[in-house]
């Protein structure tokens, strides 16, 4: 009797079971899009190449493998060195796995059969990678659709599938990329369940960090705690990106935590902490930023800046719905920040006039948010016909699209006091005229505040995936050891 167990991925214990049907549905969605594309011939086949193991420079020390995202989206395969082929007409899938030498069993473990991989990944067929040319020849596809296109965040070109004998086939490398990218922009219900999970575990880890932080600790101790919680409780071997654990003036360094600034400052009394960290499960990302006082109590200045950012974050989320243009949300956040900075006396004058000279970008030079999925900066931000706006702040937006249901984005407004940008503004008469320099001096070593939420656009608004303490009262209570659940923000005005 055939097994009725549906294949799924899980790391056991309480970790999420992800059905392999998620990837079968993705392949189906891709084929449906391709069949509607008039440029796609009958009997076409998609060919995707998975990632390969890499070593540290010239050594034999392996870097922990993480699957290439397009390949993972279509097949959910965790092993390296694989290929995948999808028959566009029928949707049937073939996974090609490496033919491993006998020595593999000595050093790396059991050599699994093709039937093992067929059951594990719920594909229609499994063959070896050294047979890909002969298998495709026997099927006689009219054209092989390979993946080649530019990632609009990095500017890098994705790797196109290549194998010995591919030159014998008719190959098209222009059709597939925009179609599969557009599929990745819109998440299925099964994908959303995984993103809810990554957010839940990462949110819990952020709360643990809030409760544990103490003056005198190193920033990297909080990074370590976050990673430990995500891995031990959530099965997250990887984080979605390098953890950014800023304290004090470091909170004005947008991408702190790199090798030259490795989260190594000692946290001091009176510091604001800005911790931007997200766990990754089965290649699905999360991206959450929490800002809070190191000693557990906001000063008046910290509270003023924090609540300004919280107001912009929640106003944006309340405004989000299908049809909204994302650059308008960035401009809305800028307006609120400038209104609040004027309210506390740091700026004076007409907010409309401030916006005309792009003063908002002095305090928030990055974009308001980005797509999220299998990559922390997920693909699809600038498809053909969507142009980047060449203005301060807005040019850093990772998408300028109109919102649609199923899109998952971050909402991450921030106010930072970056000396380099402040000095430039003060040297520009068009911007300097708005500053109260005496009040500004008070904030020169403040650092910054960022609040980052992960949300999915729904038919009527948005669903908030992140669940961490957000109000001043919730944060102070959490840091004092009160483990009450935060009140979820509904997005209702």
From Swiss-Prot:
Mn(2+) 1 binds at residues 276, 287, 452. One of its GO terms (molecular function) is manganese ion binding. It is an enzyme of class 3 (hydrolase). Keywords: Acetylation, Collagen degradation, Dipeptidase, Hydrolase, Manganese, Metal-binding, Metalloprotease, Phosphoprotein, Protease. The keyword Phosphoprotein applies. It comes from the Eukaryota. Signal peptide: none annotated. Its EC number is 3.4.13.9. A dipeptide binds at residues 255, 287, 377, 398. Binds 2 manganese ions per subunit. Pfam families: AMP_N, Peptidase_M24. Mn(2+) 2 binds at residues 287, 370, 412, 452. The modification N-acetylalanine is found at residue 2. InterPro entries: Aminopep_P_N, Creatin/AminoP/Spt16_N, Creatinase/aminopeptidase-like, Pept_M24, Peptidase_M24B_aminopep-P_CS, X-Pro_dipept-like. It catalyses: Xaa-L-Pro dipeptide + H2O = an L-alpha-amino acid + L-proline. Homodimer. Dipeptidase that catalyzes the hydrolysis of dipeptides with a prolyl (Xaa-Pro) or hydroxyprolyl residue in the C-terminal position. The preferred dipeptide substrate is Gly-Pro, but other Xaa-Pro dipeptides, such as Ala-Pro, Met-Pro, Phe-Pro, Val-Pro and Leu-Pro, can be cleaved. Plays an important role in collagen metabolism because the high level of iminoacids in collagen. This is Xaa-Pro dipeptidase.
């Amino acid at each position: 009797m055939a097994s009725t167990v549906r294949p799924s991925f899980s790391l056991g214990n309480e970790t999420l079971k992800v059905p392999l049907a998620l990837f079968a549905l993705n392949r189906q969605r891709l084929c449906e899009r391709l069949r509607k594309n008039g440029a796609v011939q009958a009997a076409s086949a998609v060919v995707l190449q998975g990632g390969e193991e890499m070593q540290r420079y010239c050594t034999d020390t392996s870097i922990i493998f993480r699957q290439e995202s397009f390949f993972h989206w279509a097949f959910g395969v965790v092993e390296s060195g694989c290929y995948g082929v999808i028959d566009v007409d029928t949707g049937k899938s073939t996974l090609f796995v490496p033919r491993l030498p006998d020595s593999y069993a000595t050093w790396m473990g059991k050599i699994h059969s093709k039937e093992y991989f067929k059951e594990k990944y719920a594909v229609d067929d499994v063959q070896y990678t050294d047979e890909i040319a002969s298998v495709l020849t026997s099927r006689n596809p009219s054209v092989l659709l390979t993946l080649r296109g530019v990632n609009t965040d990095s500017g890098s070109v994705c790797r196109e599938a290549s194998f010995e004998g591919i030159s014998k086939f008719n190959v098209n490398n222009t059709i597939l990329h925009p179609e599969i990218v557009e599929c990745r922009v819109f998440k299925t219900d099964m994908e959303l369940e995984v993103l809810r999970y990554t957010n839940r575990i990462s949110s819990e880890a952020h709360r643990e960090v809030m409760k544990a932080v103490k003056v005198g600790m190193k920033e990297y101790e909080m990074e370590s705690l976050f990673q430990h919680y995500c891995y031990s409780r959530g099965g997250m071997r990887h984080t979605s990106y390098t953890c950014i654990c800023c304290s004090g003036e470091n909170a004005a360094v947008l991408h702190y935590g790199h090798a030259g600034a490795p989260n190594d400052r000692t946290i001091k009394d009176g510091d604001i902490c800005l911790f931007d960290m997200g766990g990754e499960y089965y290649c699905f990302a999360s991206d959450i930023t929490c800002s809070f006082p190191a000693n557990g109590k906001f000063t008046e200045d910290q509270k003023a800046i924090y609540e300004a950012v919280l107001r912009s974050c929640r106003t944006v989320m309340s405004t989000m719905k299908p049809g909204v243009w994302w650059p308008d949300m960035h401009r809305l956040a800028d307006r609120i920040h400038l209104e609040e900075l004027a309210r506390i006396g740091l700026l004076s004058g007409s907010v409309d006039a401030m916006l005309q000279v792009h003063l908002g970008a002095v305090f928030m030079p990055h974009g308001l948010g980005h797509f999220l999925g299998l990559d922390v900066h997920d693909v699809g931000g600038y498809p053909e016909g969507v142009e980047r706006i060449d203005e301060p702040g807005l040019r850093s937006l990772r998408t300028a699209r109109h919102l649609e249901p199923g899109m998952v984005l971050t909402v991450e407004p921030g106010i930072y006091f970056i000396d380099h940008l402040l000095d430039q503004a003060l040297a520009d008469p068009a911007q300097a005229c708005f500053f109260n320099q005496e009040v500004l001096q008070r904030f020169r070593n403040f650092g910054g505040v960022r609040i980052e939420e992960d949300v999915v656009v729904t038919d009527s608004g948005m669903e908030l995936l992140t669940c961490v303490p957000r109000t001043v009262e919730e944060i102070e209570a959490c840091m004092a050891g009160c483990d009450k659940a935060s009140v979820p923000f509904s997005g209702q005005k």
